[in-house]
Each structure stands twice: as structure tokens, then as C-alpha cells.
Amino acid sequence: MIDFRPFYQQIATTNLSAWLETLPLQLKQWEKTTHGDYAKWAKIVDFMPNSTACINLKDKVESIPHTPLSVGETKQLTHHLKQLMPWRKGPYHLHGIHIDTEWRSDFKWDRVLPHLAPLKDRTILDVGCGSGYHMWRMVGEGAKMVVGIDPTELFLCQFEVVRKLLGNDRRANLIPLGIEQMQPLAAFDTVFSMGVLYHRKSPLDHLLQLKAQLVKGGELVLETLVIDGDVNTCLVPADRYAKMKNVYFIPSIDCLINWLEKVGFKNVRCVDQAVTTLEEQRKTDWLENESLVDFLDPNDHSKTIEGYPAPKRAVILANA
């Protein structure tokens, strides 16, 4: 099982120390209700080699072992990594193995990074972090500490496997909780919420939860689905959107800016918008499920299979 005690020790003398009032008990409760495959997934972490490696987190997430793996070792490592499928966010280049994930998350990072306040020496929260790809890119930008939260057990085990292959780097940590379970810490310099808002039944509550984690003046990085329209435009799918049953609100950019200002964010601005392409989200050998092409109208990729506008994403920055 994953041991969270090193993280508790790590934050005990930081601005996150107040979290220790609630977090250990929450994670003990979490361990009692984990997915049936969690023990199997967590055991795979133990199979990862302890070899030293050259690490690159600046322009990719890559580990190159000082002593190359043999053919047999590479085959065995690939087998273990494939047991943690599906790999959704990446890509990773680990010990000579290319994990070609469903999403080219580096595309999103390249769109977001130029607009951010410098991440060097910052304490960062990544909400809905998945397996942690963007967390490692934040570390590559010099972040002091990155904490990701995501309640999905598979993502936690994927993260811990990657961490081990990156030399057990402790600058990034994944905590398997949701934002709604966090006490207001007001301790993070930057908070990321990317690909989360449209899954929330109460988007304004989510924005308030994000704000409660930021230091005064701290930066919010919000990336979410948007729709064309004016300040009064917001799509509420009748049933599914792109085959997803948990999509509730897709606002226009102006509507989203209005929401952020309404809950007290300052200096709200849209810095990027992009239609999701079949190059950015696609099926690979590391994903057995359907992907974007299956979610779009086969005769008109400008629409989802349900007839809604195809996915378009915007990046909004704001300050607490």
C-alpha cells in the first residue's frame, strides 16, 4: 500500500502544516473503501527498479537509467506498466519505454505555460491531477512543492510508479482526495484546475473551493470546456456530452469570466482557447477504451455524437 507518512513529515514545517489536523484521518478512512484492484495496482510500485537515472522534467517527463535495461528487464517493466492501463495523461518516457498516453498532455502544457506567473519556488495545488503528468512539468519549472489531488486509485498508483522511475522525487505528491474534502488552507501560490469544472454539479462551489486554497493574490489556472456565445450562454447537456454522462455545465468564455468575478476573483482573463484535435486525444496501445474520434459525429467532426458543438477548451487566469 502507498505510505503517506513521508508527505506528512514533508509538510509539517510548511504553510501546509494545518492540513495535518484532518488529512491523516481522512486517508485512513479512504484506505478502508478503496477500489477492489487497489492492492494489486499498489504492488506494481514495488516491482519498479531502483536504478539511478538521468531525469529530464523541463521539456518532457523522461528517465534514462545510467545502466540501460536488458531486453528481458525492458519486457518485464513494460508488462508491469501495462497492468496499470488505461494510461490517459502523458506521455512518459521511462527507462527506454514510451508510454504513449491517450492525451498528449504536453500540448496543453505548451499552451498554458507561457501565460503563467513563474512557478519557480512556488507551492502548487493541482486539482484533478490524474496520474500527475502536469505535476512533473511544474517540478521541471522549479516549483518548490506540488500537491496533486485526485480520488482515483489507479491514478495514484500510476503516479507512484512514475515517481519511483524518476528517482523517488518528493517534490511532487498525489493525495487521493477531492477538492471538496480539503479544509480551506489558503496556502498555495498557484492552484490549477484543468478538465474538472464541467464535471461539477455546482460550478460556483468549485470555484469557491479553489479560491479557499489560494494565498491572497495567488494565481488560479482554470482550464475547461467552453461554448461559443455571450455572457448569458451556458450549455447544460440533456443527457451525455461526447458520451460522458457526468458533464453538467459548459459556459461561454464571457459567462465563465462572470462566474469567476461573482465569487471574488480579480484580474480575470482568457489567455488561450483551442478546439481539441484528434492528434491531442486519440486511442493508443496504452488505452483499450474509446477515444475522441468515437465521441464525435462520424460525418461532421465539428459536432459531438449527440449533436452538440465539439469540445473546445479555454484557459482562464485569475487572482485571489
From Swiss-Prot:
Its EC number is 2.5.1.-. It holds the Pfam family Methyltransf_9. Carboxy-S-adenosyl-L-methionine binds at K89, W103, K108, G128, D150, P151, T152, I179, E180, M194, Y198, R313. CDD domains: AdoMet_MTases. It is an enzyme of class 2 (transferase). One of its GO terms (molecular function) is transferase activity, transferring alkyl or aryl (other than methyl) groups. It catalyses: carboxy-S-adenosyl-L-methionine + 5-hydroxyuridine(34) in tRNA = 5-carboxymethoxyuridine(34) in tRNA + S-adenosyl-L-homocysteine + H(+). Keywords: Transferase, tRNA processing. It comes from the Bacteria. SUPFAM superfamilies: S-adenosyl-L-methionine-dependent methyltransferases. InterPro entries: CmoB, Mo5U34_MeTrfas-like, SAM-dependent_MTases_sf. GO terms for biological process: tRNA wobble uridine modification. Transmembrane segments: none annotated. PANTHER family: METHYLTRANSFERASE (PTHR43464), TRNA U34 CARBOXYMETHYLTRANSFERASE (PTHR43464:SF95). HAMAP family: tRNA_carboxymethyltr_CmoB. Catalyzes carboxymethyl transfer from carboxy-S-adenosyl-L-methionine (Cx-SAM) to 5-hydroxyuridine (ho5U) to form 5-carboxymethoxyuridine (cmo5U) at position 34 in tRNAs. Belongs to the class I-like SAM-binding methyltransferase superfamily. CmoB family. Homotetramer. This is tRNA U34 carboxymethyltransferase. It comes from Actinobacillus pleuropneumoniae serotype 7 (strain AP76).
